[in-house]
Amino acid sequence: MKLLYCLLLVILALVGLSSGAKPSDKLQIGVKYRPDECTVKTKSGDKLKIHYTGTLLNGDKFDSSVDRGTPFEFKIGVGQVIKGWDQGVLGMCVGEKRKLIIPPSLGYGQQGAGDKIPGNSHLIFDVELIGIN
């Protein structure tokens, strides 16, 4: 009986994956690594140093501070970055790593950005908080 139940779950999962389901229209935040000790978490108004790699859903990389060897610096919560970043890095600890899946409404919307990010693109960012000032 357990085998039949497990087989049914696997079949349902495969059907869901192969259906070409539309990505979520909500920000998705996955914690990949969190330090054991965290005395300070990011909050609105903090100036952050972050390493990131940005890709589209198809895996095409469009930008990476890691490749440049220089962390990106910005002030959180004041509109210096896309809304998905402002929301997605709140509450992070130095050393923490997250995966952000950002819908178009919190990214670059219908217009896209340059020639590397088409309009209505979901964005995937692997981010690591390097420092808080």
From Swiss-Prot:
MF-aspect GO terms: peptidyl-prolyl cis-trans isomerase activity
E.C. numbers: 5.2.1.8
A Gene Ontology cellular-component term: endoplasmic reticulum
Described purpose of this protein according to its UniProt entry: PPIases accelerate the folding of proteins by catalyzing the cis-trans isomerization of proline imidic peptide bonds in oligopeptides.
Keywords tagged on the record: Isomerase, Rotamase, Signal
Gene that specifies this protein: fkbp2
Identification of the protein by name: FK506-binding protein 2
Signal keyword on record: yes
Family classification: Belongs to the FKBP-type PPIase family.
Origin superkingdom: Eukaryota
Recorded catalytic activity of this chain's protein: [protein]-peptidylproline (omega=180) = [protein]-peptidylproline (omega=0)
Gene Ontology biological-process annotations: chaperone-mediated protein folding
